[in-house]
Amino acid sequence: MAPVAVGDTLPDGQLGWFDGEDKLQQVSVHGLAAGKKVVLFGVPGAFTPTCSNQHVPGFINQAEQLKAKGVDDILLVSVNDPFVMKAWAKSYPENKHVKFLADGLGTYTKALGLELDLSEKGLGIRSRRFALLADNLKVTVANIEEGGQFTISGAEEILKAL
C-alpha cells in the first residue's frame, strides 16, 4: 500500500488511550480530527532513544507555537499497547497538549501505509517516523522519514509549513 500523501483523507481507525480520568478508551481518528486542524505524528516505539529524546519532546516544547498557528490537537501514535503509551506519557510531566495514542496491533499504521518491519531487531512491525498535518481530515503536509532517520518529521518542520 502506498504511504499516505498530501491530498489524501486520513483513514479512520480505532486507537487506545487513557482519558483524563485514567480510564482506557477506544477513540476514532475521525472523531478526534474531523472539523479540526491536527498534527498526527508517529514513531517506531515508545521509550526508544530518538523518539523519547528528540521527536516527542520537540512536539511537547513547540505545542504552544503550533496552537498559536491554528493547530487544534497534537496526536502521537505508536505501535504499542495503551498501558505502555500511558507510562510513556507520564514520563513527560510537562506535557499539556500531546495525546499519546496506542495502535496496539498496528492496524492504523498499516492503513496509513507507514508500517516498518523491525523484526530483525526483535521489534516486529512498527511505524515509520512521520508527521502529518491535516485540516478537516485532509492531509496538507506529509513528512515521512526513510529508515531510522529523523530529519523532516519534527515539530520545527510542521511549524515551517504552517
Curated annotation (Swiss-Prot):
Please provide the record's keywords in A-Z order. Antioxidant, Cytoplasm, Oxidoreductase, Peroxidase, Redox-active center
- What CDD domains does the entry give? PRX5_like
Localisation per UniProt entry: Cytoplasm
Its Gene Ontology molecular function terms?
thioredoxin peroxidase activity
Class of the enzyme per the UniProt entry, highest EC level: oxidoreductase
Q: Which domain of life is it from?
A: Eukaryota
Recorded hits in Gene3D superfamilies, A to Z, give:
Glutaredoxin (3.40.30.10)
Quote the protein name from its UniProt record: Peroxiredoxin-2C
Please tell me the species this chain comes from. Answer: Oryza sativa subsp. japonica (Rice)
